Amino acid sequence: MKILINKSELNKILKKMNNVIISNNKIKPHHSYFLIEAKEKEINFYANNEYFSVKCNLNKNIDILEQGSLIVKGKIFNDLINGIKEEIITIQEKDQTLLVKTKKTSINLNTINVNEFPRIRFNEKNDLSEFNQFKINYSLLVKGIKKIFHSVSNNREISSKFNGVNFNGSNGKEIFLEASDTYKLSVFEIKQETEPFDFILESNLLSFINSFNPEEDKSIVFYYRKDNKDSFSTEMLISMDNFMISYTSVNEKFPEVNYFFEFEPETKIVVQKNELKDALQRIQTLAQNERTFLCDMQINSSELKIRAIVNNIGNSLEEISCLKFEGYKLNISFNPSSLLDHIESFESNEINFDFQGNSKYFLITSKSEPELKQILVPSR
């Protein structure tokens, strides 16, 4: 293999591909490598991890002198290319090594046998017409993911359905992005008609999707179909620019959540987000950012009082004005870190709280952002 390639184009690709690999993975070392494949008129770059695989196609600003393929350590290759100043780079396989050459630089990198690279789940014979598909505006999708991502569970020991975002298009009229760690629940609604579907995208894959920054307002395309081998998974291809992602979604049913929002509140209040946010941040500082710390919230017709007691450190009392109040007085124990995560997702400065009582979950919304609904379970 021998190619001439534009450094800027190569840098853009490697920067994103580097978000896929796991550097110095001693258990699965092949997850640290890139596969580079030069064909007659294009170059394909491959990378994978235990969750998904990625293919990037480049067919401009290249000159393919010899076809072939090689495998190279991903991070060091990315760092070396990033440190080169010249714009035109020669990449060549020579004596089972990778030669990176410019006018003033010559670097040799060890490679491994191509056959040692795990099978990439990209089949060039795939007929995409056999897949169901839908498109979402990329900016809108990323906006929704960022607003609810804090509710995704980081605990890999619980059910995997809580380690990602559920894409719920089951009614064919809207797409609901749903995330929960069983204590927090966040739902973002995208009004778009589609064929009915329902699948979960794992959090590492979502982080990779979030890393794109398209120059134009583009769409991301999701292709999906039930795996031919079993009914327990959904085969997916996700296309964005010149990248294609291969992913298998395990068909673990996400809980039905829309009915959680349908209750008659006993107490309703409206507060200023920034005032509440500042108070919660001070409490978190006192608690030394301990995410399992609990405090008490008292609600009456004029104010919301939050009392925090931290053993061996101190205590605090925060008073937040209620812009509106309807219903009964309440006293609730809650996690300030979780509440802070929820309210920071809103852009509006007026936040609505609907309470069912002292011990039941409560709803957090904003009239100016009806597409976002969030729930927090009180702590005992």
From Swiss-Prot:
Effect of inactivating the gene: Probably essential, it was not disrupted in a global transposon mutagenesis study.
User: Which terms are listed as keywords in the entry?
Assistant: Cytoplasm, DNA replication, DNA-binding, DNA-directed DNA polymerase, Nucleotidyltransferase, Transferase
Q: Does the keyword Zinc apply?
A: no
List this protein's GO terms for biological process: DNA strand elongation involved in DNA replication
Q: Which SMART domains match?
A: POL3Bc
InterPro entries in the record: DNA_clamp_sf, DNA_polIII_beta, DNA_polIII_beta_C, DNA_polIII_beta_N
- Which Pfam families does the entry link to? DNA_pol3_beta, DNA_pol3_beta_3
- Gene Ontology molecular functions: 3'-5' exonuclease activity; DNA binding; DNA-directed DNA polymerase activity
Q: Which GO terms describe its cellular component?
A: cytoplasm; DNA polymerase III complex
Give the subcellular location: Cytoplasm
| Family affiliation | Belongs to the beta sliding clamp family.
Record function comment: Confers DNA tethering and processivity to DNA polymerases and other proteins. Acts as a clamp, forming a ring around DNA (a reaction catalyzed by the clamp-loading complex) which diffuses in an ATP-independent manner freely and bidirectionally along dsDNA. Initially characterized for its ability to contact the catalytic subunit of DNA polymerase III (Pol III), a complex, multichain enzyme responsible for most of the replicative synthesis in bacteria; Pol III exhibits 3'-5' exonuclease proofreading activity.
The annotated subunit structure for this chain is: Forms a ring-shaped head-to-tail homodimer around DNA which binds and tethers DNA polymerases and other proteins to the DNA. The DNA replisome complex has a single clamp-loading complex (3 tau and 1 each of delta, delta', psi and chi subunits) which binds 3 Pol III cores (1 core on the leading strand and 2 on the lagging strand) each with a beta sliding clamp dimer. Additional proteins in the replisome are other copies of gamma, psi and chi, Ssb, DNA helicase and RNA primase.
Supply the name of the protein.
Answer: Beta sliding clamp
Gene name of the encoded protein: dnaN
